[in-house]
Amino acid sequence: MVVRYSLLMKVSFAILIFLVGCNENATSSNDQYLTDPDISEQTKKPSRPIIDEKNKGVTDTSVTIEWDKIECEKNFSHYNVIVYRKDRIEDVITIRTRNNSVFIDDLKPNSQYSIDVSSCLHSACSESAKIEFITLNEIDYYHTTEIEKNVYGSLEGEVRFVQTHVISPEGRKNEPEIITGRDALILFKPSIKNSSSILMKIYSEDGLTSKVVMKSPSMLPKTDQPIDIDENNKVVSYSNSYWSAEIPWNKMKSGMSLHFEDENGNLGIIESERIKFSAPSELIIQNIDLGMLYKPRGRNIVIKELERTAVDYFQKVPVSKLIFSDYTPIHFEKITLPNGTVYTEKSADIGGWHQGDMREAVGKALVSTGINNANLGIVASSGYSQQYNRLTNHITAHTNIGYYNNGVVVHGGSGGGGIVTLENTLHNEWSHELGHNYGLGHYVAGGTSHGPDTSWGWDGYYKRFIANFDWKRSPQSNIRPDNQEVVKPFMDKYTYLWDAMSGGYDHQNGIISRYTLHHPYVARIIQDWLKNGAVVINNDYMVWDELKNIYVYKGTNFKVPIKKGVPVVTILGVYDPDKINPSQLYPPTYSNYGNIFDLEKPRSESSLKGWQYVKDVNYLDRVNTHWHTMLVNRKEEKICRFSYLSPKGKKFEFLGYEDIENKICTGGRSIHYLEDGKKNPIESKYNDYFLLSIDGDGEISYVPDSTIGESKICSLKMSGTVYGAGFIKGNSCRQIDGVFMNGFQWAFTLNQSGVNSTYTWSNECVLKIKDKDNNIESISIPNYRIEKNQSNKIHLNISREKPIIDINVYCGEHELTSIKVSDNPDIKLLKGPIIVGQEHGYTSYEPKLPSGWFKHYDNFEPKNEINHELGKMRVNDNDEYICRFNFSDSDREMKFVGYVSQLSESKYICTGGSEIYYKKNEINIELSSKENDFEWLSVRDKNLVGSKIEFDNNKTLCVLDNRSFYGAGYLDENNRCTQDRQIHWSNGKQWLFSTYKTMTYH
């Protein structure tokens, strides 16, 4: 119970004891004390509480404090808590509780308070533990006293779910729905503010699953507001009214209901029918850096910081699981376009951010579309095709630079159809171009600006709210293009953000996020697009059924991978089955996350070729060989050939169809040979004929008789009872004179529908891959141009289990192109896959190093998996690790900050390099540590995120960021970046700069 009173007034009050603490033992001793107190216990004093500063929460109007709990000391009674304002000591709040924490509301903003806490037995109390605090001078963004009631009972109120956005549970059209299988923060605001503690119970369809003690409003998570805000701006909090608790991903599913219970037994419930769940969507984004006739730039920040960017972008998209993967970069030193053009030095085209023939044919069609197709088991497509064969939510983003007729050009700024072409993989370019892939156009709904009626975002890793306005931009109104609606700045201080598709913002707005917070209406459109994507479960493609809230089987013609999300080699190239355009295979690219399929093997490995005498064809030959057929009475029948001898001795070669049941080649009931007015059936002797395989080389022909000579074959593909095959003579497809069908000579003009006049051997095309053990894997690829005016492109994944050494493309007996494959050192630099969400949580981004400065230790190496945690500075054109060591002069010792230089394997020094030195008595002294005797700098600490990193002794670390100079130091009293006064640059001047950047934890 909380009592407020003036020392000048006498106030009587009832004492409320919270029965949370020592349970039955404590209760028993209390009962005993009421009738027969233990005299020895009456004189004993309990131990003094120890207040936990880390668990203190302060807002403008409330505070929560916590202290060490007394573990059921005999005759323990309660804690006394006394709160008073320093400038008005007559305003006192007294609380008597058995909880080891307390929430106090209705305090005065920007005021100094003191709290005394003592623990009491029935007879005596301990000395008080004291803590002082100042309530914040902050702005409560969600300050409205009105609530949207959706929790009913004696503890009614409002509940909101927080995932990518703060949303209502009912599922509104203008905001995302709750994501199944994703962690959530629950916010609860009681209608009446009289609760000191609230317990949240989580129920599923099977009953109670867990209980969570909610954090008081003063413990509500912080925002992404920069720490070094202007002194004229106050701290902004999301709200000072909501209780909060987290629910893990595996409890977030349909059928969940929530019960809220306070210390007085009041109960509020939101039933499962009022909580609308959407699909547990998954999203895969592949990332690759390209250079076309020019070396790749190596500036793809997503690839460099895969863990950080994956976790960051996860906060912006309504998915349950996000997978970021990286490919090894590709340097295209020679390029063959699908039209046959070959470049070895530069493109003949004019390149631009949005234009260039290589940009379209290589970056978008070959690489992004190719990688997407390879992960669906599609081995080839037409060379210029950018068709998005969307089944799963799989997108490939690339950065790309090319050498064109007008010089070296960086491409970027486009997205859609599973493709993203970027110059900058951070900020709004990424968010905007990915948005096009989700079906979003420019200026959704006429231009979407955040405003006072749109929700904030949430970062589940840093556990901070993301504001929907710009923290640093000067205040101004946003005006919607379509209806001129004006959105004024929040409190006339902060400009509201535009959605990514309406301009967004090209800077890091707060202290944690480098991607754009989508407007909730736009986020809902994204969610609706994503939930239609299939996932692979138990060797089947499955899609989410919103009515049943489960995954159900999806029928599709796409292959299901035999291995999902495994290391792969992706083979890309261009080939022309017609052997007109040149073909080219490119150096393979590698990823740690791709799909492997049981790809079609070439028929030629087990298939017979050409005309085959039926007695020589066994069962396996029949099964493994692809045979030419013709249409007979709407049924495909195998074409066959035999030597026919008429009753009067006329001999010719006849093309018919195989009657497999009777093992003859026949013309059937409708075709006969007319001789002397008599109709003679045309059929072979038993098992004495030839079948025609699809495989072979060149055009297919036969000799009807010696007078006609060798002729190309033709056949009919007509509905009804008209059928047959023959030879081409002049402008007709015909048989030997005398062969009739339905009373007419068997002859048809070539140009009419249903006459197939082009028969060629298949000339099968095969991709052959040889591994280091000389094993060869052969994969069938199309033996025809998919589009008649261009070459095909190859895109397929194979396993990385064994290194490959050769790749060849054959069509028939002709080798079209080949490439020898050498070891790729970039494979060791791959970081992916980074999987965020569901059971993976944020484990891929948890720090592996201590925070701040730490001593070098044995076997420490700045390996690929931790180098993103280490602070870096620019030295000439390289990013070098920041380090610090103690430098001793004869009369003093100081800290020097330099960069790490590797001497040999596992041996490092911290140095100032050749340009920075210590000057004493006109002598330049080199600045270098002893071997492995220095400190590294870790810049990862989510609890200190946004805080400036110290140089030493409360001095702020600063780093130069230009090409002319390098180094790091601290900010002096004049806000200049410097080190000790005797540290100089090579030009003889003191190392002292007014242009620099400060470093913060992330």
From Swiss-Prot:
Record keyword Cell membrane present: yes
Location of this chain's protein in the cell: Cell membrane
Cofactors required: Zn(2+)
Region annotation Disordered: where it falls in the sequence: 31-53
Keyword Signal (UniProt): yes
Keywords on record: Cell membrane, Hydrolase, Lipoprotein, Membrane, Metal-binding, Metalloprotease, Palmitate, Protease, Signal, Zinc
Top EC class of this enzyme: hydrolase
Membrane topology, record value: Lipid-anchor
Residue numbers annotated as active site: 433
Domain Peptidase M66: from-to ranges: 282-536
Signal peptide: 1-21
GO cellular component, one term: plasma membrane
GO BP annotations listed: proteolysis
Domain Fibronectin type-III residues, every copy: 45-139
Entry protein name: ToxR-activated gene A lipoprotein
Protein's gene: tagA
